[in-house]
Swiss-Prot record:
Compartments reported by the entry: Cytoplasm
The encoding gene: rimO
Residue positions binding [4Fe-4S] cluster 2: 175, 179, 182
NCBIfam families: 30S ribosomal protein S12 methylthiotransferase RimO (TIGR01125), MiaB/RimO family radical SAM methylthiotransferase (TIGR00089)
Protein name (record): Ribosomal protein uS12 methylthiotransferase RimO
Family statement drawn from the similarity comment of this UniProt entry: Belongs to the methylthiotransferase family. RimO subfamily.
Sequence ranges assigned to domain MTTase N-terminal in this UniProt record: 33-143
Gene Ontology, cellular component aspect: cytosol
EC number: 2.8.4.4
Keywords recorded for this protein, A-Z: 4Fe-4S, Cytoplasm, Iron, Iron-sulfur, Metal-binding, S-adenosyl-L-methionine, Transferase
Domain Radical SAM core: 161-398
Length: 472
């Protein structure tokens, strides 16, 4: 469906089903330097996992897909909301039961006592982006191999947990905003932007390795460079301004799709839209708005001028008619009245957003929002969630129907016996819809094809190939 509740995403090197681990244990073979890895949460956490795994491979460790073959398991946790905490604690429990030697890192790791209360046998716990600490602990329990002749085979892009044709590019860490429902700044700190040259170097390596789509992520992507005080960086001997518009312009020149995620609604977002209209970056804007009631937005410590937001949406679409807007909202925020909720529904009907995610408010330990107003009952939250979903599903169906009859570039993600599955510029991996191309079993993941859209529903598209680019 178009509207989804939050469910932590789990990526793991341990792809043997749990039910087979016990049987496999009798034949397990260990070399003394094998690491298993479980990564939970958002794409930003996935990038952290890739960085840790890359350094482990450089240090000579092997990455295994079996609990039994692992000399140690690392669990990179998520602590965004209570559902994420539960998922993380369950993953730690499974790793302890199936292996016994576990290091915990990530957002939930910032709350060591909470983990120790449930899992006292965990070897070590570190917080988010504590790469060096994680590696130090690994070296302590699984001594670093003396030599690995295959280290030189690690690609320049490092270890990637995504398919080879797309990759996440993290441009900063932390956030300077203090939204009352969020504890990310307390876990990951204030905004810390990467040097532009470093980002562009990584992007170039990704494209040269065959990556067709770069997904730009951070806690607050549109704030990139605010902490740099206007200082420029250098790339290829040329000065580069360190702001999101300048960075996006440079990324757009590399020949891959560039998709921006987690755009806070600052005024200078306007500067990105012409780049989308020019085709430098994808006409796709992931801009979490969270609510539409001025009263609730004020309680959230979010921008509260809905009239300005509607004006901005209209202005953006005039400049870039193909623009796809994704947003997320929270229903059942403490103190939310029926009137507040109706304002939100009215906003949806007027804004006509393309893709929308919906969260039922969840009490996050340490969030200011838990205590600023009366909590909403689960029954009311559930009712509002379903009403929200019903309204947005109709809007999303209408927005997708405009593509029927058009020919679009489709990036192929998967191929099975029924045909190919891909995405258009309107679809980010994992969170948006897909384009189904039935019968095309000769295509391969990573191929870019031209396809005519023949059908749509509220979430997905169906298409027929017009022309295929055989370059992976």
């Amino acid at each position: 469906m178009t509207v989804e509740t939050f469910k932590p995403k789990q990526t793991t090197t341990l792809d043997i089903p749990v039910k087979t681990l016990e049987a496999a244990s009798t034949n397990a073979v260990t070399t003394g330097n094998r690491i298993g890895f479980v990564s939970l949460g958002c794409p930003k956490n996935l990038v952290d996992s890739e960085r840790i795994l890359t350094q482990l491979r450089i240090d000579g460790y092997e990455v295994t897909n079996s609990y039994d073959n692992a000399d140690l398991v690392i669990v990179n946790t998520c602590g965004f909301i209570d559902a994420a905490v539960e998922e993380s604690l369950d993953a730690v429990r499974e790793a302890l039961e199936e292996n016994g030697k576990v290091i915990v890192t990530g957002c939930l790791g910032a709350k060591e006592n909470q983990i120790r209360e449930v899992h006292p046998d965990v070897l070590e716990i570190t917080g988010p982006h504590s790469y060096e600490a994680v590696l130090k602990h690994v070296h302590k329990y699984v001594p670093k191999p003396e030599h690995n002749p295959f280290t030189s085979l690690i690609p320049q892009t490092g270890v990637k947990l995504t398919p080879k044709h797309y990759a996440y590019l993290k441009i900063s860490e932390g956030c300077d905003n203090r939204c009352t429902f969020c504890i990310i700044p307390s876990l990951r700190g204030d905004l810390d932007s990467r040097p532009a040259g470093s980002i562009l170097d990584e992007a170039k390596r990704l494209v040269e390795s065959g990556v067709q789509e770069i997904l730009v992520v951070s806690q607050d992507t549109s704030a990139y460079g605010k902490d740099k005080g206007g200082r420029t960086d250098f790339w290829n001997g040329m000065p580069v301004k360190q702001d999101i518009t300048s960075l996006a312009r440079q990324l757009g020149k590399m020949g891959a799709w560039v998709r921006l995620h987690y755009i806070y609604p600052y005024p200078w977002v306007d500067d990105l839209i012409p780049l989308m209209a020019e085709g430098l970056i994808l006409p796709y804007l992931d801009i979490p708005m969270q609510h539409a009631s001025p009263r609730i937005l004020k309680m959230m410590k979010r921008p509260g001028r809905v009239d300005r937001q509607l004006e901005a949406i209209q202005r953006w679409r005039e400049i870039c008619p193909d623009l796809v807007i994704r947003s997320t909202f929270i229903v059942g925020f403490p103190g939310e009245t029926e009137e507040d909720f109706q304002i939100l529904l009215d906003f949806l009907k007027e804004a006509r957003l393309d893709r929308v995610g919906c969260f039922k408010y969840s009490e996050v330990d340490g969030a200011v929002a838990n205590t600023i107003a009366e909590l909403i009952s689960e029954e009311v939250k559930e009712d509002r969630y379903h009403r929200f979903m019903e309204v947005q599903a109709e809007i999303s169906a209408e927005r997708l129907a405009r593509f029927v009859g058009r020919t679009l570039d489709i990036l192929i993600d998967d191929v099975d016996e029924e045909g190919a599955i891909g995405r258009s510029f309107a679809d980010a991996p994992e969170i948006d819809g897909m384009v189904f191309i039935n019968g095309e079993t000769e295509l391969e993941p990573g191929m870019l094809v031209r396809a005519r859209i023949t059908h749509s529903d509220e979430h997905d598209l169906w298409a027929e190939v017009v022309d295929a680019d055989t370059q992976d």
